[in-house]
Amino acid sequence: SYSSTPGAEAPEKNEKRVKQYAMMQKIQKFGGAMFTPVLLFAFAGIVVGVGTLFTTEAIMGDLAKPDSLFYQCWNVILQGGWTVFNQLPLLFAVALPIGMAKKQNARCCMEALVLYLTFHYFLSTMLSQWGTAFGVDFSAEVGGTSGLAMIANIKTLDMGMIGALAISGIVIWLHNKLYDTELPDWLGSFNGSTFVFMVGFFVMIPVALISALVWPKVQLGMLAFQGFVKGAGALGIWIFILLERLLIPFGLHHILYSPFYYDNAVVPGGLYAYWATRLPEIAASTASLKSLVPEAGFTATGFSGMVPLSILPAQ
């Protein structure tokens, strides 16, 4: 009996390890798929940086006055550069199926786009009619602390990257389950993506209702977290960088920093977009970067490889 016990436990341990490995692979795959839109930041960031430089009067002088042809031409280019930053949730919704769909990835991207917009049309209409019941002032201006945003010209709740990934994840699950469903011949035109859209259309109604009930409370929590992070100063940055370094060996660091960089965890719209919008003010000011954009310290994760974590809070 003594010798049989290890043999009986070994398959269970191996099975547990296989499941853990499979789960880790899925999480890493999710992190990689989530990172896809970020690849566009390299070029878009250069365009925004150069465009901001040439449209900042404090740097270019009279050449960058708003009524000059030089300014107006560069402003056209600058506004085009904002595409990635302004439509980031939409990009996350479309990009996730590229790495997560098990079949017909391109069709799944289309389904995710259409159902993501459908979700926001449902949510927008619910809030416009019953906003007070959900604790949302839908008449407020978009941005600031209103909790509202414009997604593809739809006034809706600002659910940022988290909302986009959640809706896209639901669509991916529906796509993987339903895409190959064989309908009767007389319903043949509803096969494939059309069937996924049909089912997803009705799924989005309760999802929108739940979002209207829950997300305003989540936003209050995020505002409180933003206040805590800003108040923590260097200690908050140290904790963030420490966690990021600990997660790198597991390939999970994208999941930690994405809400900071691309979502509303610290500032509305994410740190990168926030930084880009503040560039003219920063360029025209003689104040220290720390006083102008204290939140930018969270983007200094790359310095942790050169500077010991033990001394970062002292900076």
Label each residue range with its predicted role.
Residues N191-S193:
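Juxtamembrane/start-of-transmembrane alpha-helix segments at the extracytoplasmic/lumenal side
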